[in-house]
């Protein structure tokens, strides 16, 4: 019975560590996506006024 408890405890801790690592990776991926979206918005803000001036002038 003692070895079963140790095995279950070990599996629990390994699973917890695995979930923690997955969560960190997911958060990092979301941050990368957010950064990409912000960069695209900055490019659009810089690009559209230039195109507008070229088309009107």
Swiss-Prot record:
The keyword Transmembrane does not apply. Residues 23-46 form a propeptide. Residues 1-22 form the signal peptide. Transmembrane segments: none annotated. One of its GO terms (biological process) is defense response to bacterium. Pfam families: FSAP_sig_propep. Keywords: Amidation, Amphibian defense peptide, Antibiotic, Antimicrobial, Cleavage on pair of basic residues, Fungicide, Immunity, Innate immunity, Secreted, Signal. The modification Serine amide is found at residue 56. GO terms for cellular component: extracellular region. It is found in: Secreted. Expressed by the skin glands. Belongs to the frog skin active peptide (FSAP) family. Temporin subfamily. Antimicrobial peptide with weak activity against Gram-positive and Gram-negative bacteria and against fungi. Has been tested against S.aureus (MIC=15.0 ug/mL), B.pumilus (no activity detected), B.cereus (no activity detected), E.coli (MIC=30.0 ug/mL), B.dysenteriae (MIC=60.0 ug/mL), A.cacoaceticus (MIC=75.0 ug/mL), P.aeruginosa (MIC=25.0 ug/mL) and C.albicans (MIC=15.0 ug/mL). Also shows a weak hemolytic activity. This is Temporin-ALk. It comes from Amolops loloensis.
């Amino acid at each position: 019975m003692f070895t079963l408890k140790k095995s279950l405890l070990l599996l629990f801790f390994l699973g917890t560590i695995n979930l923690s690592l997955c969560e960190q990776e997911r958060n990092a991926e979301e941050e990368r996506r957010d950064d990409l979206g912000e960069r695209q918005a900055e490019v659009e803000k810089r690009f559209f006024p230039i195109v507008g001036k070229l088309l009107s002038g």
